[in-house]
Structure formats: structure tokens, C-alpha cells
Amino acid sequence: MAKGLSLARAFYQAGHRVIGADFEPYGVPVNGRFSVVLSKFYSLSRPNSKDGATHYIQDLLSAVRREKVDIWVSCSGVASAVEDGQAKEVIERHTRCRAIQFDTKTTATLHEKHSFIQHTKGLALPAPETYDVTSRTAVHNILNDAEDVHYILKSVGVDDASRGDLTLLPRPTLSETYQHVANLKITNDSPWVLQRFIPGEEYCTHALVVDGDVKVFVACPSSELLMHYEAMHPRSSLSKAMLKFTQEFVARSGDGMTGHLSFDFLVEESASEKGLQKVLYPIECNPRAHTAVVLFDQHAAEMAEGYLTALAPEINGAVNGLKHRIVVPAKPAKYYWVGYDLVSLVLYPLIRIFILSPGSVREFIEGCYLFIQHLLFWKDGTYEMWDPLPWWWLYHVYWPGQFLACILQRRNWSRINVSTTKMFNC
């Protein structure tokens, strides 16, 4: 993952010895293992339904003991977030290593959409109208009472097939609504949440929290599949509002939280006598590192120092004699992934030209312009001139290996996230 590689490079640039560990699906080596910043790399067992996270946690514990690790920075994906909470408890119980990871209970609460919203409301913080539903009947009962309000159905679990479905409910006609809901598997074992649709711009944040203090923070515009990163100015009103929400959330949650905390926000605008009012609604929480960490490329040493405060005692708000301040990217580059842009902006529009799709020529020209602009003035989220091999391996070995595995196993996928190396099944 790009976020893990970015963090590894940050610690390396700050003068630390860095050990890497990751899953290697289908036996294809991940690109991060070839980075010059790693002193050693460990391939981890992936949690599964048969053995749970037992082997995964044991692999991590063995690596921590063997390498005498001082601090473990979790960089989990959506599918192993809770397992990392379990690993944190085991590692800190059996070693002196400090984990940058929430405990199992906190991770599970924040990871699930419905429990996160309930927790947020319990903290007396704003949250969108959200309902837990375990049957189609429950969905229709709520929709039938809705007046001038639309909702979006979201699966509570990890469901790649429905993740990109942002269908507004109710549909224009009753029959369309019933037909859409009928195609969804909504049961007690497969619960969903019905969340009020908030028209407005979407934003995401990334924060490092150590012992209840926000050490690192950034906010940026977001989308359903975010592949272009541009940090908001830290002094902008929206960025400050999202930072304040994060700090309030951490303070009210108590227990000296330590881990990564990322929120997805929607901003609702409404007119009033005082002018245009903006209301910030958190719609989802990711209790793990966010890819937006790449935006701290120019602040590697400062960011690494934020993590190391987990090892240092704090006296009167100061660590190692230095007063704490929140690290934010001052003038970061804009980030993209060349493989994604090449396909989405150039190759896909080119294919549409050959099949004579309407507007394809204009789409191709505009796409080429954007691609060249990104190539010249933006920064690739994986490439570094002094550490080029991970970038080369990602596109020439890792992804071809993944595509070949899908063909051999006849596994269908609908899209990929190049930055997280996630393939969305369908």
C-alpha cells in the first residue's frame, strides 16, 4: 500500500531502522518489500474464516520479538482493521513494543458504520440520520414515512459489489424502489444501514492520535474512489472545522486513544438570514491510516517525531523539552498514480473512440490534457527518484501477477484502487 510505503520512507529519512510486513496475495511479492528503506521484510499470513487472525497475529508477534521492534505502526486495509486491534493487545501484552493502533473494542466500534454513528451521537456530536435495517420490510417502512428526504443503503460488512452503489431511495416510482431493494440481501446475518443522503461536497481527513492528542492532521477533497490527493489549506475554515471535530471526538471518547483516525465528511449548505450556512456531517470513520498520508512527503521528520511521542513521557504538554504542535502539510504537492491515470484518462477514452461512443473524442482530448498536466506538475504517490524499484515492480510485476491470478481462478473484478492495491470483486 502507498500509505505503508510513505510511512516507511518517513521513518527512514528521520534516521530510524524500518522493518516492513505485509500480505502477499497469490504469492505475488508486494512492491514495498523492494524499497531501499527496509532493513528486512516479513510476509504475513492473511486472516481467514477457518483460523481467524491467529496466524496473522503470531507472525506479527514473532517479527516484533525477532527484530526488537520499539514501535509498530499499523497500516491495515478495510478487511483487517479489527484484527489489527487484536494484534495490538497481544503485542503490547507480551512485549515492550508500543502499537499505533486502537484496541479491538474501539476499532470495531469505529470500523462499523452503524456503531460509529451511534457512538458519535453518544458523544453529542453531529451525525446524519441513520437507521440499522435487517430486512427489506424495515427499509420500506422508513422510506414510506420519508418526506422530501432521500437515503442511501450501505452494507455494514465489507461488500465490494455494493460499495459503489449510491442509488438514492426512494426511487421516482414505488415499483422502482421495491425492485431495487429486492435485489439486495438484507438479513439479520447481513445487516445494512439506511443513511440520509446529504447533498454537498465530500471531504476526508487523516489524523495521528497519541495518548488522546492529535499529532498529525490533514484534510482533502474526497470522492467514492479517491485517486487524486490535494491537501486543503490548514487555515481554511473547513479544514479547521474538521480538525476541531477530530479533537472533540478524541477528547470525548476518553481513555487516551492511540492510533490512526480518518473521517469522511459531507458538507450541507443552507441559506438563512445570516447568509450561507455550512453544516459538517461525519458519514464514516476509518480507524486506520489513510492514503492521504502521502501528503506529508515534505514533512517526513516532523511526522515521524509525532509517532515517536508514543515512546516518550510527556511533562506539562511537552515531549523531550519541545512544546507539542500539530504537524500539517504546509505546501504539499498534488498526488496521483500514473497507472490509474493512464487507463482512466487515456486508454479507456481511446477505446470509446474505436467503438464510436458519443463524445469520446472530446473525452480523449480532455483526458490526455489532464494526464500530461499530472505527469508534469503532480507527484506520483509511489515513485521516488532515490527509491524507484517499488514503483517499477508495482506496474511491471505486481499488477500483471494479480491479473493473471484472477484469470486462472476465474475471479471477476469491477475496478481496482492502485494506491491501496485493492481489487473490488463483483
Predicted ranges, named:
Residues 1-101:
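ATP-binding N-terminal substructure of ATP-dependent carboxylate-amine bond-forming enzymes
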Residues 106-192, 199, 211-213, 235-244:
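Active-site nucleotide/adenylate-binding loops and adjacent lid/helix of ATP-dependent enzymes
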Residues 161, 223-234, 286-300:
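Glycine-rich phosphate/pyrophosphate-binding beta-alpha loops
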Residues 183-189, 227-279:
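A long amphipathic alpha-helix within ATP-dependent nucleotide-binding catalytic cores
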Residues 197-223:
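Membrane-embedded hairpin module used as a gating/binding unit in multi-pass transport
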Residues 207, 216-218, 275-288:
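A short beta-strand motif that forms the metal-chelation/ATP-contact edge
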Residues 239, 291, 297-309:
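Gly/Ser/Thr-rich active-site loops/lids in small-molecule metabolic enzymes
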Residues 305-426:
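Peripheral (often C-terminal) accessory segments that flank ATP-dependent C-N-forming ligase machineries
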